[in-house]
Each structure stands twice: as C-alpha cells, then as structure tokens.
C-alpha cells in the first residue's frame, strides 16, 4: 500500500537539468483501487462544496472555462474608453505537490465535506511512502517520504485544487475583486496550481496581491517567481496607476556533507520581490493579450504548427502506407494538427475573417504538401477532394457545443451568470452575440431554452448535419473555373484517394488530383499573360486535346476524358494512364526539338512540319 515508484516526465527546457523533470508516482494496483473507490464516493460532496474559483480536478470543467471568462473580461474592458482599467495578476505555485502540507490539505478536504473515517484512511495512505525512482539502470534504492501528497495518485489533484479553492473563497469574501459588467464578482480563477487574480488597477490590486501572499504563506506554498506576471488591461495606459506587485521568494541551496556523503537542501526566505509586467502571457496554453488581440494566440499556433506538420510527414513517410497514405494523412491532420491549432478555439472573442483565414491557412498549407501542389491550386478543391471541412466550421461547432455546456450549468454558477450578462448587456463582438449569429448562419432555429433542454447527442447530430450542408455550399460558392467539372454531393474524400482495388501509387493519386483540378503543367492551365496556345497539330491545346491527340498517341481511346471527373476509379485510372503517356511523349518531343512559346513561356511554337510529329509519335526520329 505504501510503496510507490517515480517515473520522470520531461518538461520544457534542457533534459540535462533535474528541474526540468517532473516526477509522477506510480502506486500499487491495490492502493489505486481503494483510493479510487473512496474518491468516487466522496467526490460529489467535495465538488458541491467547491467554489467557481477552481476549475481543476473537476468533472465537466477545465481550462476553457477560465480562458473564456478572462477573454470576456478583456473584451469588455477594451470595448469602451469609459471602462475602468483592470489588472490581471497571474500566479503559479512552484512544485506545489512537493510543498503541500498533508495535514493542512486534509483539513481543507474536511471543510469541503469529507468528515468521516475516510479522512483517516487517506492520511494513513500518505503518511509514510517508501519510494524508488525508475532509472535507465533500474529502480533506485527505496527512501522514506513522510506526509506527502503524491502527484499522479488519485487524490493528488483534488487535494491541491481544494487548497487553492480555499484561497479563492477568501479572496471572494474580501470584496477586492473585479465585477464583470459592474454586476458579477470575478476575483480569482484557478486551475489546480495556476491562478489569475482580477481587480481594478490601483490600490485594489495591491490589496489583492497582499491577501494572496498571506494566504499562500499560511498554506506553506511557494510561488514560481519567474512565472508570475501582471497584465494591465485598458484602452489607454497613460496616467493609470500600475505599481509593481510583489510575491514571496525562497532560495534553495545544496550543501554536501563530506563526512557522510549526504547532500542537504536548505530553503531560505529571500523576502518580497517584484513580479514582471507584461502585455501578453501564455496562460493554460492560450496566449492572452492585454489588448484582446486574437493574433497573439494565432501566431503562437502558427509557430507550433510548423514542427507538428514536420512530425506528421515524418511519420507518413516512415510508415510506408501506400494506398492508405492520404486517408492516414487526413486522420493525422485532425488528430495532431487541428486539435493543436484549435485548442480553446471556442473561447475566442470577436474573431475576424482575416484571423479565421490565418488559422485556415495552416491546414491548407498541410493539404498542399500532402498533394504536392502549388499555391495556384484552388483552396476549395483541397478541402473537397480531401473530404476536410474548413476550420471556421470546427470553431463554430466547438463554440455552440460550449454554449450548450454553459447553458446546462447551474443558474447560480459563475460561468452561467457570466454568459447571461452578455445576453442582457451585449457589447459588440460579445461571445453570446457570436453564438446567436452562428445559429442563424447554420439555420438552427432553436431558442436558448430549447438548446438547454435537448440532449447533447441530439444537439451534436443537428450541428453536424447543418455544418456538413453549410460547409459544402460554402466551398462550392468559393470555386472558380478549376475543378468546376467535378460534382460533389457531400464532403468526403474522393474515391481515388481512399484504399481501392486499382494499382495506384501515391504519385499516381497526386497526378489524378492535378488532372481533376487542372494543375498539370500545361499552358492552358496557367493562362495569365499568355496568348492562345496551339498544339503541334495546329489545334488549340488543352488537357482533353492532349489526351485525344493522335499525334502523341495513335492508339484510339474509347474512354471519355470526362471520366477523370467521375467517381469511377477504374475509369479514372484508364484516363490517367493514357494522359500520362501522352504528356511524357509531348514533353520529350518539346525538349528534343527545342520548342519555345511565343510569349517565352511553356507554350508550343509551330516550327517543325507536322510530318515530323507523326514520325515521332510512331517511334521514328
């Protein structure tokens, strides 16, 4: 029961530094089952007694709740010059699980509703731990730890969350916090060991800062000073009081005992130190901006996407997927890329068209690399051929599902009241107003009460059906001349790209894509600044003519060229093979006879007699 092994998980930074390793405790199966049974029994009571200041370790709550409210506050303050400046105080506890005092944590759990002998059992399970570290050379010697909260154990996160929640309750009752739209108090938002204090700039910010310092000291916790920041939110920062906030700092020194060989770790109080001021800060994976600029987070997503795309293609190329290549590529796109760049996308406020396009271009860049096509390929065709819906519709879906989540919260919950205030006192670009526009655009004629009443699965079904119809129409409306010959009834991957019985290589699939979308390197497909181009036979050249031209291939072809635009893979392959042979003969002929375009492009200039073309097509030179 009291045996545990530590497995290290690398964090950001050098792998050579011990401080960049996080230790996760792995406990015995018997202990895990017992603690899980206790947790399942006591969680409802604990959750009921926790405040909305803490979203960590709670069911149906998470990062997006806090990000949504913080972005809402920033958006509201930036909506008018008349709004009072707000100061965000961002705090992070250093190695909180190592610092938690077990007896204090259990006292807070008792206040949260656990008052029977379960408390004694939790205490005995954590009073003394015999731990060892998993290393490349095996387990280390076991050492005894006393009165610890195990990170990775069933009760670890909830014990930490309840401790921070107790600080949040003190802050709420102090009255130092901010009131959203001058009505709803929002003083502190936490997610396990990450906190954001929210006050008006000035003396209230100093009062809140002092209170958090005192309550943190009472819990024997320590701040990670480098991660603590303050952010002033206002239209005009001139003449706004913004003195430095301070937190307690502790310094750690290691002393080696030469006689015993032991290393002693000593912590020394270093006093109050200033925390840095910033205009943008990463909080729970989302880049906050003091001006409410969505591009700060979008640019971070664009940078992040570079290595994700490289990682995806590295996997695709190493797995030798053959006919499963494109299908797996789209799966990786959804699972690895989209899930990363659209993280917390439902919490954006006033997202502009240009900002949406910046997010969509990330995926479009991936699709261009997947098909190995140039920037001239129509964007709509990338989506339609791959069976992929643009990111804007995924954002709408996430936003409306989050709307459903908020509406299903208890009426007294903070996030529910937060949203209701947006409906009652709307400002331009409010999240609530955006949701109503989404419902109208997707032609979902439901009131908020009806959305609240319907089941989640039914609402998802309505959303998916509506998005599929609207996304298809949106992409069709964006089409130009290229790809217009292809008929799409729904958004799904084209038949020639999915596994089939035809012997098609990956390059062959890409070539069919370029044929269907007129991206083959033929002058008529790129007509800008070019005069009309004729084939060597004197007829106006286009892709269909190259396919049928007898001067390139004397064999009579019965398969219509237009079958390349159909869903019949067998006919598509027949057209592709004939066209590929003809285009290669044509290119070789042009190269050997040094044909030049009249406009210095790749158009065919009529210089040699037609007889030479006839002879060339029959193998005579």
Give the positions of each predicted feature:
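Conserved pre-catalytic core of RNA-dependent polymerases
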Residues: 1-166
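Catalytic palm active-site di-aspartate
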Residues: 3-6, 22, 70, 86-96, ...
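Conserved, non-catalytic sequence blocks in retroelement Pol enzymes and Pol-derived host proteins
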Residues: 26-31, 55-64, 79-80, 94-98, ...
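Short, conserved micro-motifs composed of acidic
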Residues: 137, 224-279
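Non-catalytic, peripheral interaction segments enriched in hydrophobic/basic residues
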Residues: 191-193, 224-229, 233-235, 240, ...
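Helix/loop segments that flank and initiate small ligand/metal-binding modules
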Residues: 444-540
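Short Cys/His-based metal-binding microdomains
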Residues: 526-575
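Long, charge-rich boundary regions
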Residues: 564-619
